[in-house]
A protein has these predicted regions:
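TPR alpha-solenoid repeat register
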Residues: 26, 33, 67-69, 98, ...
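Short coil/linker segments at helix-helix boundaries
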Residues: 79-116
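Structural marker of alpha-solenoid helical repeat scaffolds
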Residues: 19, 60-62, 123
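Short coil/turn linking the two alpha-helices of tandem helical-hairpin repeats
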Residues: 24, 31, 38-45, 74, ...
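Conserved small/polar residues in nucleotide/adenosyl-binding loops
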Residues: 1-6
């Protein structure tokens, strides 16, 4: 669970959503819980936990939350790819094979970022954050 103190709350929401997946209040509370938990995990440097939290929001029938989760996943993947490249940079001249392997990992994360952001753009083409982030990801993939 992303936030231990609220395990019972989340379990109740999950059970409720199984019975009534269109219940707007439960969808909103569940989505908001996992968006906040994902952002908190991201700030704490727990990227995997953040990714898991954001992914729980994607299936929900809530345009704004889904867009925010996809955007957050895109940023998370982009940052991960950038960190992989940064750590691999010193290897570029000393160990070309290892650098190439790390660059391939980074490119995979950039591709994931692009996929998430493009999906977010389809759902909410007006979203300014998505519009700003997409060209950055595309530029780094050239």
């Amino acid at each position: 669970m992303c936030i231990r103190d609220s395990a019972e709350y989340v379990a109740t929401l999950e059970e409720g959503l199984k019975v009534d997946p269109k219940n707007k209040t439960m969808v909103k509370n569940y989505g908001l819980h996992y968006l906040k938990a994902g952002l908190a995990a991201q700030k704490a440097g727990k990227a995997e936990e953040a990714e898991d939290c954001f992914k729980k929001v994607i299936p929900l029938d809530h345009k704004q939350y889904k867009t925010n989760a996809l955007y957050s996943l895109g940023v998370l993947c982009y940052n991960d790819g950038a960190n992989i490249l940064k750590k691999a940079a010193p290897l570029a001249n000393s160990d070309a094979d290892k650098y190439a392997a790390e660059k391939e990992k980074a490119d995979g994360r950039f591709k994931e970022a692009l996929d998430y952001l493009e999906e977010a753009a389809k759902i909410s083409p007006e979203n300014e954050n998505v519009k700003k982030m997409l060209p950055q990801v595309k530029a780094v993939m050239k």
